[in-house]
Amino acid sequence: MTEQMKPSGIEWIGDIPNDWKIQRFKFCGAVLYGCPFNSDFFTNEDTGIPLIRIRDITSGTISTYYEGHYSSEYMVYSGDVLVGMDGDFNVRIWDNLDALLNQRCCKILSSKKINARYLAYYLPHQLYIVNQLTWSTTVKHLLAEDIGNIPVAYPQLNEQQAIVRLLDKECTQIDSIAADLEKQIAILQQYKKSLITETVTKGLDKSVPMKDSGVEWIG
């Protein structure tokens, strides 16, 4: 039986299932903004507490540590949903060390009716739309009201959890295949270089006698 649909009222979302709801994010979640920590206390040595900067949301890695005073409200833990507020507005489910959240990054806090991982899958496309609608001659900046006004379409919590389980499984498989393909591409690129080098220095006939070129890397 085909599921009944209804208009979402949002042009880029289109129709949604009849039993789904749609609300602005400010009515079903909150945002914790990073702190403008004093860079005088930044270090590249792991003698302080890990600090998440905007570039780390893309990479998922930590390269900066903080040795000053801080409030625990700015702590980020594994499973938290983070958004970079400059550039491409990247989203990441944090899966690294517990860390502090620096300025120009934010943590998405969902209400009890929204699964955090569901939001992590949902937000990237919505933030892409925001990015496209944001005019700028330099780096684009995400504002507080931009996040609060994002329309969130969502089903009951148990269906959100089912959606997350499916996407976790499928995306893991896709990432694994992509990693294998990248390895194969690297091998093929190396073979291509070797083939070209071998052909332009040894010729087509591999049976002819060889002589020392006098150049170490040619042979």
Per-range role (PLM):
Residues I57, I147, L204:
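Hydrophobic pocket-lining residues within nucleotide cofactor-binding pockets
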Residues Y33-F37, L127-Y128, K193, L204:
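Generic structural signal for secondary-structure transition and capping sites
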Residues V31, I57-G60, D88-F89, K107, ...:
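Active-site/binding-pocket entry motifs
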Residues Q4-C35, N149, A153-L157, Q161, ...:
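Non-catalytic DNA-recognition/assembly elements of restriction-modification systems
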Residues R53, S72-H125, T134-S136, L143:
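A short beta-sheet element
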Residues Q23-F41, G48-S78:
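Sequence-specific dsDNA recognition surfaces
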Residues P17-Q23, G148-Q189:
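Amphipathic alpha-helical segments
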Residues M1-I16, T172-I218:
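Short amphipathic coiled-coil heptad-repeat segments
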